[in-house]
Amino acid sequence: MSGARAAPGAAGNGAVRGLRVDGLPPLPKSLSGLLHSASGGGASGGWRHLERLYAQKSRIQDELSRGGPGGGGARAAALPAKPPNLDAALALLRKEMVGLRQLDMSLLCQLYSLYESIQEYKGACQAASSPDCTYALENGFFDEEEEYFQEQNSLHDRRDRGPPRDLSLPVSSLSSSDWILESI
């Protein structure tokens, strides 16, 4: 980086801290330790060393992203080609995030639907286990307004059919938080 220059009036440690590259903001304070260790006395020797380190790091990252000798070939083959610029990369990232959010909402809706179905099934099992509610299970009526009619019809149906049938189903004693673990 031949554009490196010392800030006017800077000397000693201040010279290292005041180094700037044309077109770039000043180096953050958190990286000043790197400059001090790399400079070794002369500021120009330190920058050359940093340039070599940066070039080597860039080569390694390029090889890894291309799947070169670094062993990243399988990973690079699974990823789509790099977008040509930052705007394209951001657009691609935004598109992937929207897709992930839609998938997340879809899975959440399916999970909630499954939870509601399980709660209905538990209610049906509990209704079936009670001795006076066989009609509700057979016809799917669970409305409180029709409770009177259900009881009357179930009593009438029992007399017509003869001895009562055993419609008991196994009732699980799962709490509301255990149903997820049980379903997996």
UniProtKB/Swiss-Prot annotation:
Disordered: annotated segments: 148-184
Superkingdom, natural source: Eukaryota
Compositional bias of kind Low complexity: 167-184
Chain intervals with Basic and acidic residues compositional bias: 154-164
Family: Belongs to the FAM89 family.
Official protein name in the record: Protein FAM89A
